Amino acid sequence: MTRLADATWPEIAALAASGAVLVVPVGATEQHGPHLPITTDIDIAVAVVEAAGAHDPLLVTAPAVAFGSSGEHDGFAGTLSIGQEATEALLVELGRSACATFACVVFACSHGGNAAPLRRALDRLSSENRPVFGWWPRWDGDLHAGRTETSVMLAIAPERVRMEEAAPGDIRPIDELLTLLRSGGVRSVSANGILGDPTGASADEGRTLLDAAAADLVDAVARFRLQQQSTGRQSTGRQSTGKRDGVRT
């Protein structure tokens, strides 16, 4: 695994010439209940990308995008949102810049609120024939700061999880919550900011989820490379999106 932040520009040029793929973790800075840190989405995105890089030496991890579209978490202290338009513009410009060096650029997104601006950014970059695609974890389960995210955080940073503060939030299915979330945000349905129940989370479950996501990312990159080779041109577009990529908050 290579971190872009640790490399010099000549080293990066050599990596790009060897066919390396740049993977950009895309997270958010937002509340994750009383038990998880506000950088949870960043931490998870970076962990998945670095785990994937351990299996593919040609994956280069970029510094994470730390801010995104988190307006649904307004009203909770610590949430720092730049909105959808700014997120889209940021990703477009990052994609353009990264494609000047790398033959393939992947945006690995762990925050559902970024899904719409990322899709629009990918559409824009694709229309410019830039070799980019987006990826989301294929995780089912609860929506925000619940069992899934808590388990992954217990696997990657247990010292930062306050399990003594973990409690169920709104556990209704997404079909019952979506209209309320769109109109009033998370605060309108969950006083503690949780959508789901984190109390059953475990590090073992988190490691299983992390390993599966990393393997899926490696596979998605391999398929994209193959597509580029088979078409003989720069393939672009959205790839490997989970069922809840536009819903998880």
Residue ranges and their predicted role:
Residues M1-V106, S110-R233, R238, G242-T249:
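Extended, histidine- and acidic-residue-enriched regions that form the cofactor-binding/catalytic faces
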